[in-house]
A protein has these predicted regions:
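HhH-family (HhH-GPD) DNA N-glycosylase catalytic core used in base-excision repair
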Residues: 1-137
Length: 137
């Protein structure tokens, strides 16, 4: 069984430029994933969802050791993996991922986040989760 405290680095993964609809409150990260919200904590590692459905957003079911063994055969990837241990490719809502990609053209992470947040406020459903207010994608 993987050690989720070290095999998944929530901070690095969320800030890697894959995900733009997130908020951080201390040890808690809130990620909008389509019509759901994921609350993630690093220590102790914990995932809670608004929908109460199990998610593998951080790909907890992947064999991280096997993946690293295969991808680090490339020298550049090997060097990068040492700088960002626990960085994961996320399993996010496909429609949200596609729109995020379109919005990201010729932009930077703060602007992409702002544009997507405005889309959520304009068209998303307003919900309360863990005593906080969010707009779903």
């Amino acid at each position: 069984m993987p050690d989720l405290h070290t095999d998944i680095n929530i901070h690095e993964t969320i800030n890697s430029g894959q995900i733009f609809l997130w908020e951080n409150y201390g040890n808690e990260w809130f990620v909008i994933d389509g019509h759901d919200i994921i609350m993630a904590k690093q220590k102790p590692f914990e995932i809670t969802t608004f929908s109460k459905k199990p998610k593998n957003f951080f790909r907890e079911d992947d064999n991280y050791g096997k993946i690293l063994k295969n991808i680090t055969k490339d020298k550049i990837v090997k060097k990068a993996s040492k700088y960002y241990p626990g960085l994961r490719v996320t399993r996010q809502d496909p429609f949200q991922c596609c729109i995020s990609f379109i919005v990201s053209a010729n932009s930077n992470i703060p602007n992409i986040r702002m544009r997507l947040q405005k889309l959520c406020i304009k068209f998303g459903t307003k919900v309360r989760f863990q005593k906080r207010e969010f707009f779903l994608f």
